[in-house]
């Protein structure tokens, strides 16, 4: 979740998003950015309906053409009128650079492809913060987006190699290559213990946790 002034933007809608919003006292939502169409990134979309009513209008969502097409196919009720159930989402296919604006607040965003197994997911850079949630490779041509970062939030699913996600070695290789001021490892699976990671990671690299 990104908060800039009174602009509230969520990245993906995970299955537990209602719990996360309640626990972290997030009461407003203006837009949603999607990294890709897999269920663990999207199935919480139905929990967003209260924000449609609160905002008195459709919630703008952003994603690649592939992601938006998949969302429209999987969650038709969010986009098509049905008696008694108005569409709650307005879909926007992103380009490399776009922005989200609310009143005088503007969030500038750069989007780029990353490899995630058999598909491409989208990485985002928002004002010196990069977010790469599900990824097993960042194409060389897209490393330019990861220069001069304050924070790199990066996939780190497992200790051992995985066909569609970074493991710890992969994540650290990217961190050492692009040299952000700080890095946060996310998407941690059960074989990556939080407290053990804290002991072995460099001082500027942190394991993520709920509510961070």
Question: Language model features by range: what are they?
Answer:
Residues 139-212:
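Binuclear metal-ion centers of metallo-dependent hydrolases, dominated by the metallo-beta-lactamase
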């Amino acid at each position: 979740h990104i908060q800039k002034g009174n602009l509230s933007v969520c990245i993906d809608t995970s299955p537990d998003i209602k719990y996360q919003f309640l626990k972290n006292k997030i009461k407003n939502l203006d837009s949603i950015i999607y990294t890709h169409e897999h269920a663990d990134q999207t199935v919480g979309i139905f929990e967003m309906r209260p924000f449609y009513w609160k905002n008195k209008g459709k919630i703008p969502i952003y994603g690649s053409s592939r992601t938006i097409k998949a969302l429209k196919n999987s969650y038709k009720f969010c986009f098509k009128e049905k008696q008694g159930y108005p569409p709650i989402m307005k879909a926007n296919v992103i380009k490399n650079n776009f922005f989200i604006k609310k009143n005088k607040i503007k969030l500038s965003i750069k989007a780029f492809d990353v490899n995630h197994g058999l598909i491409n997911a989208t990485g985002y850079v928002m004002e010196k913060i990069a977010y790469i949630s599900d990824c097993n490779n960042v194409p060389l041509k897209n490393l330019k987006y990861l220069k001069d970062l304050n924070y790199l939030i990066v996939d780190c699913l497992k200790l051992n190699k995985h066909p569609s996600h970074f493991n710890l070695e992969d994540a650290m290789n990217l961190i050492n290559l692009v040299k952000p001021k700080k890095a946060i490892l996310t998407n941690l699976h059960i074989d990556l213990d939080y407290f053990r990671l804290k002991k072995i990671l460099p001082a500027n690299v942190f394991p993520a946790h709920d509510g961070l």
